Amino acid sequence: FPDATDPVIVQAPGRVNLIGEHTDYNDGFVLPMAINAHILLAGSVRNDSEVHIYSIDFQAKSTFNLKNFIFSQEAPWSNYIRGVCAMFLEFTELKGMNIVLQGDIPQGAGLSSSAALEVGTALLIRNLHGLNTDKIDLIKLAQRAENEFVGVQCGIMDQFISMLGKAGHALFLDCRSLDYQLVPAPFTEAKIMVVNSGVKRGLVDSEYNLRREQCQAAVEALKPLLPEITALRDVCLEHLPLIEQLPGEDRKSTRLNSSHQI
């Protein structure tokens, strides 16, 4: 974009999760940490309502108009940016933008490249438009973009650690209250190794949403016996026999996945 002026540059990291797989959307506790791989975005405002995006990694462009845009089948990578724009437009006006992005977070490796793109886009839009939206609200906005626009019913952990991660620290997060604490993790006598299994995964076309539905189905099935519960976080080890007794062969996966959470 040779005519771009006053560019803004932001970055957002990927993450690994030390404790708490699939517990964030069950209102549980998680302990992720940011990694030294990021998505970098550079942007500038335009004089119209169009958003022009260029991905260096994909060597691909995507363009849409803020006044009328939809989910893109042709450029699915752009939907994370489109979704964040859609969330901002619920409470403020946006100018058109030129956006260039590049990253070194391996895609489809479970390191939350999508959350990093959402968080980076949210920071970029805030800074380009001089908004005062705080980081917690940006985290919630980024999660909603993935839930409501992209269509993945993710929890809030990935966006949280991408926004608030700090070098040398893990982040202990209560996914119900959103209370969090940065925990020093110097690892002087140990190292965290991130190993690529070679198995590609993508939340949009995976069974991620099904796992969430099964966990919620277990909660609904248990409510007649445990009326006080609202999520699997409220179910204790002593309640495991109740999970195992849920009737129906079609609920076998529900029993297994919900038991794993507890």
What are these model-derived regions, one by one?
Residues F1-A115, V119-K135, K140-R144, F149, ...:
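ATP-binding N-lobe of GHMP and related small-molecule kinases
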